[in-house]
Structure formats: C-alpha cells, structure tokens
C-alpha cells in the first residue's frame, strides 16, 4: 500500500501543517538530516522548517503524486502539543496515522524526532 508517513513540526506551541509521504516514509530521518543543514541559524522556526522539508521532499519525489500537505485538524493539533507527555496523545496519533512509517513529530528546536516509529492504525 506504500511506505506512508505523516510528518508534523512543532515547537511545543506552534504546529505545522501535516506533510504526507506515500512512498518515502523510510527516508524521513535522512531528509531531516539534510534539513538540519538548510536550517542552521533558524532552529525553532516551525513554518520554515516545514516549508524547507516539503522542498526537500519535492526534489526527491518524481511526478505529481505521493507528496501532500494539509492543515492539522484541531484535535490533532492539541495532541501534538501534548505529545509525548500522555498515553492518550500516543493513542490519538496512532489513530490519525496511516500505518507504515507512522506519524513523525519533529521538534523544530534542533529538528530532532520526538517520535519515529510505526504506530498501529
């Protein structure tokens, strides 16, 4: 069905749109390493981190499919802000994920993964 991932950037207050990857979920860690180089000096900038990540994805994904972006639904936005502090936030993100590579929450301060694991759908 794919190697899907949903990537969301946050600083604990602001939350980016969701970046959807259909085939490249396993590439997220490598692309985040590339993003760290691009974002030097702008650590913590949720909007630019998300935008530049989308740009990196765009250069790697051929055609007009397999890369999407949409607004985070309000309940998920609240959940992202609470993650990883509660079991409930993990459950809600698991239910929101599309399976495969799961939901990836990226801390915009230093672009570290707050979560990168398969979450059951």
Residue ranges: model-predicted function:
Residues 10-15, 107-109:
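Short acidic-glycine loop/turn motifs at beta-strand connectors
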Residues 4-9:
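Short beta-strand scaffold segments in enzyme catalytic cores
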Residues 35-121:
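Low-complexity intrinsically disordered segments
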Residues 14-48:
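Short, flexible N-terminal segments of the mature chain
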């Amino acid at each position: 069905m794919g190697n899907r991932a949903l990537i969301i950037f946050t600083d604990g207050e602001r939350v980016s749109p969701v970046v959807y990857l259909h085939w490249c979920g396993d590439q997220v860690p490598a692309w985040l390493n590339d993003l760290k180089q691009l974002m030097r000096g702008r650590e913590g900038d949720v909007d630019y981190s998300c935008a530049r990540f989308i740009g990196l994805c765009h250069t790697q994904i051929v055609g007009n499919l397999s890369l999407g972006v949409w607004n985070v639904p309000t309940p998920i936005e609240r959940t992202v802000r609470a993650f990883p502090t509660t079991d409930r936030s993990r459950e809600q993100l698991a239910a929101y994920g599309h399976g495969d590579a799961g939901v990836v929450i990226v801390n915009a301060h230093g672009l570290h993964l707050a979560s990168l694991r398969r979450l059951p759908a």
